[in-house]
Amino acid sequence: MNERNAVFFDVDGTLFKQGKNVPKSTIRAIAKIRENGHLAFVCTGRSRVMVPKTPILDIGFDGVVAACGMYADYQGKLLFAEEMRQEVLDDILPVLQRTETMYILEGTEYIYYDENTIGNAIDDWYIDAIRTMIPGHFIPVPKDSCKIRASKVSIQVPPQRAHEVIEAAKKNFQILLHYDNIGEIVPKGYTKASGIRRVCELLGIDRADTIAVGDSINDVDMLQFAGCGIAMGNATEPAKEIADYVT
């Protein structure tokens, strides 16, 4: 390894758990990483607008990889920001509406919700958290899909319709299910690992000099890709199995 490494941290379940603050020990550890000349990045499935200054960025990071590898910035400057193509949106949205799937479209600046299905949310805390975190940026899906600027879709699908949604989505998307019927739909070819790879190429960082820290199913690819993959003690079994170390 070179003298400078790049460390990529997942957010939910890694930096902090639902309803809890970021541990002071974690804040100190990230500060120490940077003091020693290394780079620290957020690497999350959340879209960029869902990575607020408080409580996340105030910790002190060099950059952000968001939306499962579709967005990245470094030292306040945009590196890349990809969006779902309109024809892809026009293909999947009718399926989500027909199956009464609660879905939100996550973009760099806005989170869009469907007024007809928002009431089908299985976990109200998730919707409440978005409203609290980004007031003014949580808006109804525009009637004209041309106005949508989204990178990924988060879904809560009725269990009996899950197979239908998965079958319809697999043409253009990869589906990451955190539970049987709660998950993320991300355009094919984009993962946290692809985001890290692209950041490394742009910044001249060797893959061997990367460290990834995560806990969930959408962290597996980056734990495998990084020079060193670290799974949290509370991680899912797939994450633990692929990691080099478990905390």
Provide a role label for each language-model segment.
Residues 1-9, 28-31, 35, 205:
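Non-catalytic pre-domain segments flanking phosphatase-related domains
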Residues 33, 153, 223, 244:
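Residue-level signal for inorganic ion chemistry
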Residues 3-20, 223:
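Asp-based phosphoryl-transfer active-site loop
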Residues 7, 64, 102, 229-231, ...:
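Short, well-ordered beta-strand core segments
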Residues 57-60, 67-68, 168-172, 225-226, ...:
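Short, structured coil segments at secondary-structure junctions
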Residues 95, 99-213, 217-221, 234:
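Conserved acidic, metal-coordinating active-site core of Asp-based
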Residues 206, 225, 230-247:
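Asp-based, Mg2+/Mn2+-dependent phosphohydrolase catalytic module
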Residues 19-121:
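Active-site phosphate-binding/coordination module
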